[in-house]
Amino acid sequence: MGKITKEWVQAALKLADNGQSKLTERERELFGLSSERLRCLINNVCAVKDISYLEIGIYRGSTALAAAYGNDTTRVVGVDNFKYDEREPDKWAPEGFIHSNMKSQMEANLARYTTGDNGVTLDNIEIIESSFEDIDWDKQKKFDVVFFDVVPVNTSLYDDFFN
């Protein structure tokens, strides 16, 4: 696990405020719900060697790719059950189904990085297709950075996860 200090995060935020990170226009423009500033911040924070990044609610993968881009030793774990999409008319997928467009777009975004020296080490990215509540977190390695991007969420759900 990498060591992230308060000073590191402050410097990462200052860089992100100025639009500075390792991200290219490609990563900045991937469709997703995160802002360019947030992607830059996550990319900068995850630049510490051997960082472990968890994203709950990976959606289409743009923020997770920002964590991985240019950070060769960063381990990225993304969790999503692909059952809720606030951009769909029926936000919740019918029982027994997922929003397959979300999952296929996430897979397509990852597939863009399968060839050549492209800034992303796909072997360091793991996608868990599950509700985060169903994962036995005691069996997971610890994470240095957690991006909890789940909608809808309530305070007790958030508190239960982090306690």
Locate predicted features.
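S-adenosylmethionine/decaboxylated-SAM
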Residues: W8, R26-R28, R39, N43-N163
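A conserved catalytic-core signature of glycosyltransferases
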Residues: E36
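Rossmann-like AdoMet
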Residues: M1-L33
